[in-house]
C-alpha cells in the first residue's frame, strides 16, 4: 500500500504539486489538467509512486482503439466533391480508387471528403500504396496507437486546439500523416517549454488558442482556455461538418448518449467537455470509439496525457470519470454533415 507520505516525498523530489484550473465560468471553456480536488499531474504522481514502490503498473495500458469504418457522411461528401471536380480530375481520382486495395481506398475516400485535390490524392496514394493495415492504423491516425497514445497538448490550456487536431486526424489521413511526419514526438510534451519537442504542432495549437481569446503558457504555468464551438465550426470547409453545442443535464443523459452513439457508428469522432460538480473549469477531450455492449464502453482521447481512456456508461452516468482530474461530461459537440452542392 502506497502511503500519503510517499506521495508527498515524490512531490517534493519532483517539485510538482496539484494545480488549480482557471476559468471564467460563463461559457463551457476548457484548459489543462484538473482542479484542486485532484487528478491530472497529481494522478501521474500517484502512479509514479505505485510503480516506484511496488514495481507494478497502477493502470493497465489501454488496448488499441478499434478504427471506425468510413461512414456515410464522408462517403456522401466524397461523392459530391468528385462530381464538382473538372472532368480530368474526376478521371484521375476514379483511376486511383479503381486500382487501390480496399484499405487504401477507404483512406483515399476519407482524404477526398476532407477537400483534398486530385493531385494531393495522387501524391498520398504513392505514400500508402502497399502499406499494411498496421502501418496505416498508426500513421494515418493521431490517436490510439498500440500503446493507447496519441497527440498531446503542448500548452497548459490548449486542450481545445489539440482536440481539434485529434478530430481532423481521425477524419483526414493526409493531415494525420503530415502531423506525424512534422512532429515525430507528438505523443510527448515538455512542461516547461511548449515549443521544445513539437514546434509546428505547438504553433498550430497556439494559433487557435490565441485567435479565440485564450492565453498560451507552458504546461507548468496557468493560462487561459477557450470555448470550443466556434473553433470547431471554423473547420467546416475542410471537415464538412458543423457542430452543435449541447449540454448534458441528468434528464437528457440517455438522449445525449444516443446522439453520441449515432455519430460514432457513422464514423464521426465527437468532441466533449468534462468538468466536475461545482467546478467552473473544464477540459476538452475527443470520443473516438464506442462498444455498444452491454455494457457500453467509450474510448476517449485525453489531450492532456495524450492517452486513450476507457469509460463505461455506468461511470459516465455516476459522474465517476477520471479524465485529467475531471469526473463528468457537461457538453457534447454533436457533429452533422454539411454536404456540398455540386457546382458550389
Residues covered by each model-derived region:
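Alpha-helix initiation and N-capping motif
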Residues: 75, 90, 105, 118-121, ...
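Conserved active-site-adjacent core of cysteine acyl-enzyme catalytic domains
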Residues: 63-66, 73, 97, 124-127, ...
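Compositionally biased, intrinsically disordered low-complexity regions
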Residues: 17, 27, 32-36, 40-42, ...
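Residue-level recognition of short, well-ordered coil/turn positions
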Residues: 101, 174, 267-268
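Non-catalytic, low-structured ubiquitin/UBL-interacting segments
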Residues: 2-148
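Active-site nucleophile-adjacent alpha helix/oxyanion-hole segment immediately C-terminal to the catalytic cysteine
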Residues: 2, 64, 68, 73-76, ...
Amino acid at each position: 500500500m502506497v502511503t500519503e507520505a510517499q506521495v508527498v516525498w515524490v512531490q517534493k523530489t519532483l517539485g510538482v504539486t496539484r494545480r488549480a484550473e482557471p476559468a471564467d465560468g460563463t461559457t463551457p471553456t476548457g484548459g489543462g489538467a484538473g482542479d484542486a480536488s485532484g487528478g491530472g499531474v497529481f494522478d501521474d504522481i500517484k502512479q509514479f509512486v505505485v510503480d516506484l514502490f511496488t514495481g507494478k503498473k497502477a493502470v493497465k495500458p489501454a488496448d488499441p482503439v478499434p478504427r471506425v469504418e468510413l461512414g456515410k457522411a464522408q462517403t456522401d461528401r466524397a461523392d459530391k466533391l468528385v462530381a464538382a471536380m473538372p472532368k480530368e480530375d474526376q478521371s484521375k481520382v476514379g483511376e486511383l480508387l479503381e486500382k487501390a486495395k480496399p484499405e487504401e481506398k477507404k483512406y483515399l475516400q476519407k482524404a477526398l471528403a476532407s477537400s483534398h485535390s486530385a493531385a494531393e490524392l495522387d501524391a498520398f496514394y504513392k505514400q500508402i500504396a502497399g502499406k499494411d493495415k498496421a502501418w496505416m492504423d498508426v500513421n494515418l491516425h493521431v490517436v490510439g496507437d498500440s500503446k493507447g497514445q496519441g497527440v498531446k497538448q503542448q500548452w497548459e490550456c490548449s486542450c481545445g486546439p489539440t482536440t481539434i487536431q485529434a478530430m481532423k486526424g481521425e477524419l483526414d489521413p493526409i493531415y494525420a500523416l503530415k502531423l506525424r511526419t512534422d512532429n515525430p514526438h507528438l505523443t510527448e510534451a515538455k512542461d516547461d517549454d511548449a515549443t521544445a519537442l513539437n514546434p509546428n504542432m505547438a504553433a498550430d495549437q497556439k494559433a487557435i488558442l490565441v485567435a479565440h481569446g485564450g492565453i498560451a503558457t507552458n504546461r507548468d504555468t496557468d493560462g487561459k482556455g477557450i470555448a470550443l464551438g466556434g473553433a470547431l465550426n471554423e473547420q467546416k470547409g475542410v471537415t464538412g461538418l458543423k457542430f452543435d453545442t449541447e449540454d448534458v443535464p441528468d434528464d437528457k443523459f440517455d438522449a445525449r448518449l444516443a446522439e453520441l452513439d449515432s455519430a460514432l457508428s457513422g464514423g464521426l469522432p465527437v468532441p466533449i467537455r468534462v468538468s466536475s460538480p461545482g467546478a467552473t473549469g473544464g477540459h476538452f477531450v475527443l470520443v473516438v470509439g464506442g462498444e455498444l455492449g452491454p455494457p457500453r464502453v467509450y474510448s476517449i482521447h485525453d489531450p492532456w496525457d495524450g492517452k486513450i481512456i476507457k469509460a463505461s456508461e455506468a461511470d459516465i452516468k455516476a459522474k465517476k470519470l477520471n479524465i485529467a482530474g475531471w469526473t463528468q461530461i457537461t457538453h457534447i459537440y454533436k457533429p452533422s454533415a454539411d454536404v456540398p452542392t455540386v457546382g458550389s
